[in-house]
């Protein structure tokens, strides 16, 4: 009676944006915040989102459904967080439910193209200090 659903959960981060991906057996649906990839705006950044799909081919995504929830950050940071979560979800699913050889193949493809598909960028905003308008800039002095 109890049927276990084959699923994995991964996350992607960029600056303050966090994307959580749920990957399970399905028919190839990929949704971000309840919307299909084709309807995401801005359109120029949609190509960045489709990079993992184009790199490994759509046939690898045919038997999985991926739901991604993203929050925080700006538009570009969210797109980068989503693409990282997407790539990591596929690798984790193949590792857990398919085979090790396919997983290693996927990881090598992603790493060769862009390492940020699998590894988060650790850079964060530097905090503002006193004596100036920003983190490093100082207020101008006048000697009169």
UniProtKB/Swiss-Prot annotation:
Family: Belongs to the universal ribosomal protein uS9 family.
GO molecular function, one term: RNA binding
Region (Disordered): 124-144
Tree of life domain: Eukaryota
Cellular component GO terms, alphabetical: cytosolic small ribosomal subunit
Residue stretches spanning the membrane: none
InterPro entries membership: Ribosomal_Su5_D2-typ_SF, Ribosomal_uS9, Ribosomal_uS9_CS, Ribsml_uS5_D2-typ_fold_subgr
UniProt xrefs under Pfam families: Ribosomal_S9
Family annotation (PROSITE patterns): RIBOSOMAL_S9 (PS00360)
GO biological process, one term: translation
Modification N-acetylthreonine, positions: 2
UniProt entry keywords in alphabetical sequence: Acetylation, Ribonucleoprotein, Ribosomal protein
The protein, known as: Small ribosomal subunit protein uS9
């Amino acid at each position: 009676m109890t049927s276990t659903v084959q699923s994995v959960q991964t996350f992607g981060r960029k600056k303050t944006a966090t994307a959580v991906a749920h990957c399970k057996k399905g028919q190839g649906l990929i949704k971000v915040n309840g919307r299909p990839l084709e309807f995401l705006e801005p359109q120029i950044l949609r190509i960045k989102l489709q990079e993992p799909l184009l790199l490994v081919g759509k046939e690898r995504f045919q038997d999985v459904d991926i739901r991604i929830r993203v929050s925080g950050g700006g538009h570009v940071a969210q797109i980068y967080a989503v693409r990282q979560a997407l790539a990591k979800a596929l690798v984790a699913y193949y590792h857990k439910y398919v085979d090790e050889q396919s997983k290693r193949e996927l990881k090598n493809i992603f790493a060769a193209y862009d390492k940020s598909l699998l590894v988060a960028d650790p850079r964060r905003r530097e905090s503002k200090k006193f004596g100036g308008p920003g983190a490093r800039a100082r207020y101008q002095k006048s000697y009169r």
